[in-house]
Amino acid sequence: MKTICMMRDLYKALAEFEAQFEKEYDLSLNEAMILCALQEAKEEMTSTALSARTGMAASHTSKVIRAVEEKELIKRALGKTDKRQMYFSLTPKGKERLKELNLEKVEVPERLKGVISGLDKG
């Protein structure tokens, strides 16, 4: 039971962080994860690759992609060899937006600080 209670506390802390993050940056964490994945890849990615990289379900990834496209932070292009395949990349506005993300502006709940510092070590 202790593990479930700890997971509940982590979930609540993450929800609190996400609300603060979205208020500060006008981006959901999922939208930010799409931008981060594209930045780390340093090349165009398919929605399938973005889904795998972020851990989101394919249907949810499509919704998030549409949201960041509407904000003009990413763009889509047809595949060069397979015109049915779509590839996504950061726009200049998206790259600039990533530079603006300063997490010091958003208070990370204590419960998450330990988890985050543990991930940095791995």
Language-model features: locations:
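Amphipathic, well-ordered alpha-helical segments in soluble domains
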Residues: 10-13, 30, 64, 104
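Charged, amphipathic alpha-helical coiled-coil/dimerization segments
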Residues: 66-122
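N-terminal helix-turn-helix DNA-binding core of bacterial DNA-binding proteins
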Residues: 17-57
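Surface-exposed, interaction-prone regions with an acidic/low-complexity signature
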Residues: 1-5, 58, 111-116
